[in-house]
């Protein structure tokens, strides 16, 4: 509520891991997500590409010009000052990522043909919608079928789970 200037930057739990593995260790990484096909979506794609992360698994969703059907998720973070911590506000309703379904991704191709060795996902993506958790479970099950290592960031944000069942649903 106090900020008057914004700086755009890319980030997110799963992406941060992929970018870190690419930049710090030179590993090939990719993100599996969905973005609205508009200028903000292309900006997000550019941030991901600048991090050296493969974007070929992004599902581009048609944008209607106003966001009635699909949007790109945003998170506003006001820096802390002194003893006051940072304050974050998520704006993630009706996003492309929240609409991504397990059937939208060819998991057999990714874990089988490509032989992806590691899947990293987490609680923030799982909380985006009723079906996001189902998508996570489907991805994890398919990864396990192929012997792919799975890591899961337990990051629990009460504000994201509040409207879909709270902590009980998150567990």
Segments and roles (model prediction):
Residues 1, 33, 152-154:
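Active-site flanking residues adjacent to catalytic metal/cofactor-binding acidic residues
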Residues 2-11:
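Short pre-catalytic strand/loop immediately N-terminal to key active-site residues, enriched for Gly-Thr
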Residues 3-4, 45, 133-137:
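Short amphipathic alpha-helical segment that frequently serves as the phosphate-/nucleotide-binding helix
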Residues 9, 16-28, 50:
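Alpha-helix C-terminal capping segments
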Residues 13, 40, 135:
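Conserved alpha-helical elements of sugar-nucleotide-dependent glycosyltransferases
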Residues 28-123:
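Conserved N-terminal subdomain of the carbohydrate kinase-like
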